UniProtKB/Swiss-Prot annotation:
Organism listed in the record: Mus musculus
GO CC annotation: cytosol; filopodium membrane
Signal sequence extent: none
A Pfam short name: RabGAP-TBC
InterPro entries to which the protein is assigned, alphabetical: Rab-GAP-TBC_dom, Rab-GAP_TBC_sf, Rab_GAP_TBC_domain
Protein's name in the database: Carabin
Length: 444
């Protein structure tokens, strides 16, 4: 039955493997409206047909994902390693809309907060944030078919999602880097699901990234430099010599989740792994880019100054950024969660005195889908087993019972009781006569 349901689901999804808005938001002749499989007009997604999996292999992966999502709790409880492996291979395009909300926990958040997004979307937004959001709408993927028209459902949906987040977290407000992140989510998800995915990314995967001080970005910048010094010491030395600090390139990478830095197919593969394994994927991607751009002596020699070095980080050959080739190198980077957390604690101790805002809390960052799933399951158990408030019940006083009376047996013999029970005695000689007469003289 599960297989039949999975095949029905695949048949519904395979007719749209890119975006939700592939219809007529553009005007003009059809040649000018032709978009690639990801929805970019003129094929601007940077897609290269190298090392692409075959149709049969894609079909097999789709069936595996359908089977896992149909039994998601069982899969995450017992077979998370399989989920991680499949995420590294890449989630099929037709199933990202189903898998991303499950991986990041947005599906459970939406279930636990029914009607919240509708209330936020219907409420008027803060004029301060609405003006800033309105200026940024046309900058998010202007060559994507969803976001070309100002009145199209892409820009309008993006406006509603970003406005809803400013109302959901008014103390944080809006950060410009949330725009491209929310736009990528809207390419695959309806606005409500995109909103809850954005909430999970901002509050669970990358807490402190999009606040007013962005203190977590500063912390991760120092962590990245420490990891770079350990794994690529010559590249680290070159950056120090030319004066390229991490804040010159890392915010664009990490805050936007590489949406503005890499080809779109590669970005999607990074997101698949990021939603599965957490923030350490971002560090692995950053280290891989450093090695590809400045890993050789010739590359470093060709970059004698700051501008040349920053240009080299943006001029990596597209063939090296193709998703299959690039992601295989990303996953080969040795970086465990334990090492990352250890380095975070070291750098946090050094930065806590100099940060203008509150110190970031690295323990609030959950390392991927498994930790999020376990956290939500634990929260559900606590909610279901919540103890009731004790109640004091006052019972009315009972009426006193009369004391039990003992039967009056004083002065009463057994013979007297027997006479009352059996009636008058049988006629015969008196007791004195019976005592003096013999047994044979007794009359019956």
């Amino acid at each position: 039955m599960a297989q039949a349901l999975g095949e029905d689901l695949l048949s519904e999804l395979q007719d749209d493997s890119s975006s939700l808005g592939s219809d007529s938001e553009l005007s003009g002749p059809s040649p000018y409206r032709q978009a690639d499989r990801y929805g970019f007009i003129g094929g601007n997604s940077g897609e290269l047909r190298l090392c692409q999996p075959s149709a049969d292999l894609i079909r097999q992966r789709e069936m595996k994902w359908v089977e896992m999502t149909l039994h998601w709790e069982k899969t995450m409880s017992r077979r998370y390693k399989k989920v991680k492996i499949q995420c590294r291979k890449g989630i099929p395009s037709a199933l990202r809309a189903r898998c991303w909300p499950l991986l990041c926990g947005a599906r459970m958040c939406q279930k636990n907060n029914p009607g919240t997004y509708q209330e936020l979307a219907a409420a008027p937004g803060d004029p301060q944030w609405m003006e800033t959001i309105g200026r940024d709408l046309h900058r998010q993927f202007p060559l994507h078919e969803m976001f070309v028209s100002p009145q199209g459902h892409g820009q309008q949906g993006l406006l509603q999602v970003l406005k809803a987040y400013t109302l959901y977290r008014p103390e944080q407000g809006y950060c410009q880097a949330q725009g491209p992140v929310a736009a990528v989510l809207l390419m695959h998800l309806p606005p409500e699901e995109a909103f809850w995915c954005l909430v999970q990314i901002c509050e669970v995967y990358l807490p402190g990234y999009y606040g007013p001080h962005m203190e977590a970005v500063q912390l991760d910048a120092e962590v990245f430099m420490a990891l770079l010094r350990r794994q690529l010491p010559r590249v680290y030395k070159h950056l120090q010599q030319v004066g390229v600090g991490p804040l010159l390139y890392l915010p664009e990478w990490f805050l936007c989740l590489f949406t503005r830095s890499l080809p779109f197919p590669t970005v999607l593969r990074i997101w698949d792994a990021f939603l599965s394994e957490g923030a350490k994927v971002l560090f692995r991607v950053g280290l891989t880019l450093m090695r590809l751009a400045l890993g050789t002596v010739e590359q470093r020699t060709a970059c004698p100054g700051l501008l040349e070095t920053l240009g080299a980080l943006r001029a990596i050959p597209p063939t090296q950024l193709q998703e299959e080739v690039f992601m295989s190198q990303v996953h080969s980077v040795t970086l465990s969660e334990r090492v990352l957390q250890q380095e975070i604690r070291i750098q946090l101790a050094q930065l806590s005195k100099s940060l203008p805002g509150p110190a970031p809390l690295p323990q609030a960052r959950l390392p991927g889908a498994q930790a999020i799933f376990e956290s939500q399951q634990l929260a559900g158990v606590r909610e279901s087993t919540k103890p009731e408030i004790p109640r004091i019940v006052v019972q009315p006083p009972e009426e006193p019972k009369p004391p039990r009376r003992k039967p009056q047996t004083r002065g009463k013999t057994f013979h007297g009781l027997l006479i009352r029970a059996r009636g008058p005695p049988i006629e015969g000689p008196s007791r004195s006569q019976r005592g003096s007469a013999s047994f044979l003289d007794t009359r019956f």
